[in-house]
Amino acid sequence: MCGPSYCTLLLIAASCYILVCSHAKSLQGTSKLDLGNHISAGSARGSLSPASPALSEARQKRAMGDYKELTDIIDELEENSLAQKASATMQVAAMPPQGQEFDLDTMPPLTYYLLLQKLRQLQSNGEPAYRVRTPRLGRSIDSWRLLDAEGATGMAGGEEAIGGQFMQRMVKKSVPFKPRLGKRAQVCGGD
């Protein structure tokens, strides 16, 4: 009785493996940036719930926008790379290629997002992306970054008028640590 169900399970697993391998090989035959067709084909296959066509349409538009932006950035980088290679070949006759190709079809979404962020950062002349830093509980927040040189000199007269208390408060702001105690902690503490 266990034999036919095991064989059936094995047959299903083998057919799924063959299906996945054939789909992966069909994707390998495409060009390196055929992601736009892959995105539209993925959305054409349909989602599991028919109640979210607006959500899938918005997701597809966002993905296509990111795709177009990525292709523009890659084209710019390729043009810059070709110009650099042309100038380098004039100086040095033989130089090994240092480019690295990325397979966007098999790239995980997080890696794709990080690559897109890095390309945006490189395109914006190496300026680091803005990151919001939140202080840890119980630590102090330095507010000196909020004050620039002009603002600090403008406030110097006001500081003397108040007696130095304003700048004292601006220099260090403490965040007290208050642990949240739920019902379980209150019950355990009451025993």
Curated annotation (Swiss-Prot):
Leucine amide PTM sites in chain numbering: L137, L181
Alphabetical UniProt keywords: Amidation, Cleavage on pair of basic residues, Neuropeptide, Secreted, Signal
Signal peptide range in chain numbering: 1-24
A Gene Ontology BP annotation from the UniProt entry: larval feeding behavior
Pro-peptide positions on chain: 25-119, 185-191
Keyword Ligase: no
Domain of life: Eukaryota
GO CC list: extracellular region; extracellular space
Molecular function (Gene Ontology), one example: ecdysis-triggering hormone activity
Tissues showing expression: Expressed in a subgroup of neurosecretory cells in the subesophageal ganglion from embryonic stage 9 to larval stages.
Keyword Transit peptide attributed: no
Locations listed in the record: Secreted
Main location: secreted
Function: Probably has a role in larval molting.
Family, per entry: Belongs to the pyrokinin family.
Name used for this protein in its record: Protein hugin
